[in-house]
Design a protein with these regions (language model features):
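Single conserved hydrophobic/aromatic residue that forms the stacking wall/gate
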Residues: 1-13
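Phosphate-binding glycine-rich loops of NTP-binding sites
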Residues: 10, 14-45, 276-291
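Conserved ABC ATPase signature
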Residues: 17-20, 234-287, 312
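Nucleotide-state sensing region of NTPase/ATPase domains
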Residues: 33-128, 132-140, 144, 206, ...
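C-terminal lobe/lid and adjacent interdomain/linker elements of RecA-like ASCE P-loop ATPase modules
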Residues: 64, 81, 317-359
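Loop/turn-to-beta-strand initiation segments
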Residues: 110, 301-303, 327-332
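An accessory alpha-helical subdomain
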Residues: 114-217, 228-231
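Walker B catalytic acidic pair
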Residues: 308-310
């Protein structure tokens, strides 16, 4: 048990060297959301080398808990097993209930994480920006994860069907087209739901993010967020039918929400092409602060902020902006830089060899 009880406050964690366990702590807190590690990689990489599994135990207290007394926390036990263990993967038990897949925690512990790797949101591939939207939606609307998984399952089946099979193993054409029609029907239903949720969320997120950017840049540029859709609402089924022969020739799916993008613009120009390093940081910081504010507006509850070594990536102006916004909600922030915490009112801890101690 290395963490004190912190409610509605800032917790700053520092060390003089990398590799002492700061990020591991934030990663452990993030896993309570039901999401995968924000650093990527496989679940098995969360387990200490040579061990069959890892265990995380925590108590969380939400601002609104309808089924419990106001001061009664949720006791969460999360296990991560390697492929060779008795229970591979991530499983979670809440208040002594039977373990279930950790993804079932979605929505029970709201959090927003920001680490230097998120700068790729601007100049990286569209997949990263789609994941940004989908991860936020999974926390806000637990049912979204079910829809998203159904879509991915149908998409995987469709791509397997479209792939050219070895000679002599190809399905009869009529059978292939019949299966394709069934899968396209499922993709149209789930894909429409995915796009509808993304569009609605973006309507809330965009004004917040753009206002944040204007404040950060002192009005130097105007930021815009635009959903780059392949189809209008209600039009996915027709699009899938129209491009069916093209997909058969290509051997893969070519349309749907998995091919769409979130465009980030500065003064009408694509940020992925023209944004400087400083502008990229401002865009991502604006998005992450907007993600937290949108979650608070939708749920009535501020998510926990997890900021992993991002202060050192920011200039003084952006750093002061972030430190000011940190005061609005519970925040865990890590840094190797002592000066990063000079202007914070939060409690400061040192992490050394995985051991946390108050300074």
């Amino acid at each position: 048990e290395i963490m004190p009880s912190l409610v509605g406050s800032e917790m700053c964690i520092r060390d003089s060297n990398n590799g002492q366990g700061k990020t591991n702590l934030l990663e452990a807190i993030w896993l309570l959301t039901g999401g995968k590690s924000f650093r990527g990689g496989k679940d098995a990489e969360l387990v200490r080398r040579g061990e069959p599994f890892a265990v995380l135990e925590a108590s969380t207290l939400r601002a609104q808990q309808e089924e419990q007394e106001p001061d009664e926390p949720n006791r969460v036990r999360l296990t991560v097993g390697t492929p060779d263990s008795q229970r591979p993967g991530r499983y979670a038990s809440v208040n002594g209930a039977a373990p279930r897949r950790a993804a079932g925690l979605a929505g029970s512990f709201p959090a927003v994480v920001f680490d230097p790797g998120h700068l790729s949101l601007v100049k990286g591939a569209p997949e990263g920006r789609r994941k940004f939207l989908d991860a936020a939606l999974c926390q806000l609307y637990p049912g979204y994860l079910t829809v998203y998984r159904r879509y991915l399952r149908a998409l995987q089946q469709k791509n397997a069907l479209l792939r050219r099979s070895p000679a002599g193993q190809e399905r009869p054409y009529a059978e292939k087209m019949a299966l394709l029609e069934v899968l396209n029907t499922e993709l149209a239903a789930q894909g429409e739901a995915i796009q509808q949720r993304r569009r609605a969320y973006l309507e809330r997120l965009a004004p917040l993010a753009c206002a944040n950017y204007e404040e950060l840049s002192h009005g130097a540029e105007r930021m815009e967020l635009r959903y780059a859709a392949q189809f209008e609402p209600g039009g996915l089924a027709a699009l899938l039918k129209a491009r069916q022969n093209e997909e058969v020739r290509a051997g893969q799916s070519l349309c749907g929400p998995h091919r769409e993008d979130l465009e980030l613009l500065l003064d009408g120009q694509p940020a992925r092409v023209f944004a400087s390093q400083g502008q990229q940081r401002s865009v991502v910081l604006s998005l992450k602060m907007a993600e937290a504010a949108a979650a608070a507006a939708i749920t009535g509850e501020h998510p926990v902020l997890l900021l992993d070594d991002v202060l050192s990536e920011l200039d003084d102006g952006r750093k002061q902006y972030l430190l000011t916004r940190m005061r609005e909600k519970q925040t865990f922030v890590t840094s190797c830089d002592d000066t990063a915490f000079l202007k914070t009112d939060g409690e400061v801890y040192r992490m050394n060899g995985g051991v946390l101690s108050k300074i």
